[in-house]
């Protein structure tokens, strides 16, 4: 049975997967570091020995396709899982982001 956790407003960042095996898209969202996690999420991740900042996010696919990598999204989401599966964050595909911050990728070398 899926986790029964509350929804929270959390920051996520888009990134490119190193391996797309088993995934529909190469771009995904993960929890942005350096934010305070609700105790409910922190405790569940600790119990399952999971790094909350490495979990993927199920949400509106527009965030993968219509924004550049490294864009940050403030979403209403919750921690959940599927029976026998790994945990992930869920935000309904019908919901809009509360805030979006586009990041410009800088070149590796500057003159």
Q: Where would I find each of the regions flagged by the language model?
A:
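Short nucleic-acid-contacting surface segments enriched for D/E, G, S/T with interspersed K/R
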Residues: 60-75
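OB-fold/S1-family single-stranded nucleic acid-binding modules
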Residues: 80-111
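Short, contiguous, well-structured surface segments enriched in hydrophobic/aromatic residues
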Residues: 26-49
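Short glycine-rich, polar/acidic loop-and-turn segments at beta strand-coil junctions
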Residues: 33, 61, 77-81
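Structural detector for short beta-strands of small beta-barrel domains
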Residues: 2-23
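A generic structural signal for short beta-strands and their flanking turns/coil linkers
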Residues: 25, 53, 71-73
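Short, structured beta-strand/loop micro-motifs enriched in basic residues and often containing a Trp
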Residues: 49-59
